[in-house]
Amino acid sequence: MKFSLVFFFYLIIFSLSSQSIDPDDSFTFELGLPNAINNKAYRSIMQGLVCISPSYQYALKNGISFGVGLHYSYFAINEYRVQPKIFGGIHSAVAFLKLGHEKFWTEGFGTETGCKIGYLNSFALSDSIKNYRRTEATFIEPFISFIATSSVNSSYRLTIGFPFYGFNFTPETIGILDSNLGYSNADFSKIASAFTISFGYTFYFNGKKNPDED
């Protein structure tokens, strides 16, 4: 992760000499690492392994952007935190709408802030579940992205997100029916959520010409 951060800030420095981008319609692909927060049992038992998010958006001249996309995340059960040991995890798939604001502060650096709201299907699988346990919920993810341009049509980004998965995690979610594993009901009261750090690539279909080329 430290190497990735150093690499990203190198891209920012490199991008200071690049051409600016006039956002229009674009496609972004992000790959990241989720870390469970908020719900105490979820934070202790589940380990975030991956989150993936492809999306398409259109940005107006004032920077307001609208988009659609998909989100996938996987949290594995930490078998050392449950008794008896069980193996498995929770797959979450989301289709979302996105509203944000994208602004380029220099020719090579920009930011985007916004929120993704969508419909979530979560599938828990473990040794204690015969088939799978499905949960449907509302997905909400506020985020901020730091963008470094690399050409008139492309950029790289570091995104920090806070996805709320919309369900209350309990041991029953992963098939443990006869024990609270030492947690109280208050520990299950908060919605399962995460803190994510993702790296992404954006392709701008419109790009931008230099002023002397207009």
Label the model's feature ranges.
Residues I140-D214:
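Predominantly the C-terminal beta-signal and adjacent terminal strand-loop region
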Residues K40-L49, E107, V152, I191:
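Solvent-exposed loop/turn segments connecting transmembrane beta-strands
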Residues S55-E141, S145-S154, S193, S198, ...:
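Gram-negative (and chloroplast) outer-membrane scaffold detector with strong preference
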Residues S18-F66, G200-D214:
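Short glycine/proline- and aromatic-enriched beta-strand/turn motifs that initiate or cap beta-hairpins
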Residues V6, S17-S20, M46, Q57, ...:
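Serine/proline-rich low-complexity intrinsically disordered segments, especially terminal tails, linkers
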Residues F3-F14:
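Sec-dependent N-terminal signal peptides
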Residues D25-P34, C115, Y156-L158, F188:
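Non-catalytic effector/regulatory segments
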Residues K40-M46, N78-K85, F123-N131, F169-L177, ...:
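Outer-membrane beta-barrel translocator domains and adjoining extracellular loop/strand segments
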